[in-house]
Amino acid sequence: MPMDVILVLWFCVCTARTVLGFGMDPDLQLDIISELDLVNTTLGVTQVAGLHNASKAFLFQDVQREIHSAPHVSEKLIQLFRNKSEFTFLATVQQKPSTSGVILSIRELEHSYFELESSGPREEIRYHYIHGGKPRTEALPYRMADGQWHKVALSVSASHLLLHIDCNRIYERVIDPPETNLPPGSNLWLGQRNQKHGFFKGIIQDGKIIFMPNGFITQCPNLNRTCPTCSDFLSLVQGIMDLQELLAKMTAKLNYAETRLGQLENCHCEKTCQVSGLLYRDQDSWVDGDNCRNCTCKSGAVECRRMSCPPLNCSPDSLPVHISGQCCKVCRPKCIYGGKVLAEGQRILTKTCRECRGGVLVKITEACPPLNCSAKDHILPENQCCRVCPGHNFCAEAPKCGENSECKNWNTKATCECKNGYISVQGNSAYCEDIDECAAKMHYCHANTVCVNLPGLYRCDCVPGYIRVDDFSCTEHDDCGSGQHNCDKNAICTNTVQGHSCTCQPGYVGNGTICKAFCEEGCRYGGTCVAPNKCVCPSGFTGSHCEKDIDECAEGFVECHNHSRCVNLPGWYHCECRSGFHDDGTYSLSGESCIDIDECALRTHTCWNDSACINLAGGFDCLCPSGPSCSGDCPHEGGLKHNGQVWILREDRCSVCSCKDGKIFCRRTACDCQNPNVDLFCCPECDTRVTSQCLDQSGQKLYRSGDNWTHSCQQCRCLEGEADCWPLACPSLGCEYTAMFEGECCPRCVSDPCLADNIAYDIRKTCLDSFGVSRLSGAVWTMAGSPCTTCKCKNGRVCCSVDLECIENN
């Protein structure tokens, strides 16, 4: 789609939004405190005075609380979030200084789909969400746990994140679009993460979720609201993608239609029937007089049905007889001679030959053919005047029998008899129809067979799972022994009456057709269960269920450059530049890209007065000639610290700095747990109270105050009975495409854009599908002619993958 069309659409959105304004639709918001029905008697909270009197405020302080939504509220929340790319969480909070806690969490079991957390110890606000089935965290440095009132508004618009604090825009970031289709069973928690973790300590007021663009306007009406949001733009892009998908489908249909037309041009569409040299068009009907059938031409095939004859009620002086050229008997007058009754056409030999015609015996002067047998062997056939020799072919003279009957010679006459499997129509054996032996139960099919009717006969077919013994009997088929089954190699095949059944072997799970190995404790960090309770671990992990990270640094598997130090990460490691060094932008895995920082050239040194800065590898030195100017004092925050002076940083009460010979050195405060006045905030390891211990996320392990541990790509620390967790620091990557592999916590560089997790939603990076239709970056479609192949436009390249389960099911 041309860029000018997109700009026109963009202008239309801007204009429409400016004109319509921002009226609040009550169906597009959720008042959390009202929906949770909090009252002063709710366990764990106390109603208190808030920042204003327009709404209720509640103090959250007791850890023995479970403030979560009722099932009907959870269902309402799921419906509100469904397919929404734009929402804002608002609240007015007053958090106890230096504490950590979750203000709001929307989660299902262990998955946080929306969670806002404030950490006092690290002075940051964290937004936890899910993208592509994986947890994501955005850490936003800000000190909100200060005992003061704050208005907080976190807005998400597709891949755009906005954080307003006290109506000031604090952060604006591009993030991976969060998953908003909440699974059944999702729950909303206020003031805590779940039953045991993330307890917020402080007051919460005005908790709301707004499902409309620029929802922060509800809290701060004077903020700018005229610009379209990221979601607006992505909606336009999605509209273009939908049009492209429609164009692709129409192109496919057009190509198919053109192919069909090309085929039709080379053939005659109408299917005709040719019978006895005559051509009949489709749906033409005619009478097959020879066989007394009504026939129709249907799509090139002849379908015939036996003509039905009406019942005859002949008078006493007439008899039903066949007339040549007619299919049904008719009533004709009978003749009587010497007590013998003759029907129309029958003859009798008296002195002369006479034939019954119209009820009168008429003299026949027809000459008889000469015979080649002796007179004593002559035979007079019934109702005839001419004698014949033995073995005479009466069938050659008799009326023609139908297709399902056959002529049979007797000594004195010929008759039509129905073939085996047929029965006469209305008592006339010249015309016969099929006997359905199956329906009439006239078959001899035994058990484990199915009777199948055929023209003139029937067949006994074996039911599935059985093999034929003779024409009427079947015996059970050994599917398992013969290998004619679809059981998985790790399944047990059992013969059954219907055929066979498949059951997974002990230690495997599945439907028998597909059996997967089962590991009771699971395989963590992307490990694969290859046999019962046997995991194959990905690189960087070990243990019976891949629960142990391999410390490549401690094990000596890695040798970092001397300008860097090895930092272990779950499943991986990286070489981090030492203090006084920085990366040159090539980000070498071994740390070779760490180069010295020239503090002197950058004027980041602390040399004072007449002293000269001398750059050193990983640091600097101050050289001062002897004299009164060489005091060794240090400049600090616009002031001066004397040589030998020690002080505590105002922004970090847990760090102490000293000035020595013009250089400033800072370190963490040493902890003396024997000192009764020790600062437990800076020295949590000195807090021996039982109430200050922390339960880990699994609820299985207890940590002491001050302990550190790693969980799900987060670094956690126990402080005053509450675990504070933050994302592990990952090395910077200077490559275009990155991917996070299963079980790892940090992305790696990849050269193939199809392997990359990150997608550049750039309308200039398009792809051409198999029909030549242009697709925007991020578009997904099914490959033509291959329903199990899905393609995606990633960074200007078509990336296709095959769904193996789809192939198995189709």
UniProtKB/Swiss-Prot annotation:
Residues 434-475, 476-516, 517-547, 549-587, 596-631 form the EGF-like domain. It comes from Rattus norvegicus (Rat). The keyword Transport does not apply. Residues 271-332, 632-687, 692-750 form the VWFC domain. Its main location: cytoplasm. The keyword Ion transport does not apply. Residues 57-227 form the Laminin G-like domain. It is found in: Cytoplasm; Nucleus envelope; Secreted. CDD domains: EGF_CA, LamG. Glycans are attached at residues 40, 53, 83, 224, 294, 372, 511, 562, 609, 708. It comes from the Eukaryota. This is Protein kinase C-binding protein NELL1. Interacts with ATRAID; the interaction promotes osteoblast cell differentiation and mineralization. Homotrimer. Binds to PKC beta-1. Interacts with ROBO3. It has been demonstrated that ROBO3 binds to both NELL1 and NELL2. However, NELL1 is not expressed in the spinal cord at the time of commissural axon growth to the midline and has no significant effect on commissural axon repulsion in vitro, suggesting that NELL1 is not a functional ligand for ROBO3 in commissural axons. It remains possible, however, that NELL1 functions as a ligand for ROBO3 at another spatiotemporal location. GO terms for biological process: cell differentiation; negative regulation of osteoblast proliferation; negative regulation of protein catabolic process; positive regulation of apoptotic process; positive regulation of bone mineralization; positive regulation of ossification; positive regulation of osteoblast differentiation; regulation of gene expression. The gene is Nell1. The lineage of its organism: Eukaryota, Metazoa, Chordata, Craniata, Vertebrata. Ca(2+) binds at residues 434-435, 437, 453-454, 457. Keywords: Calcium, Cytoplasm, Differentiation, Disulfide bond, EGF-like domain, Glycoprotein, Metal-binding, Nucleus, Repeat, Secreted, Signal.
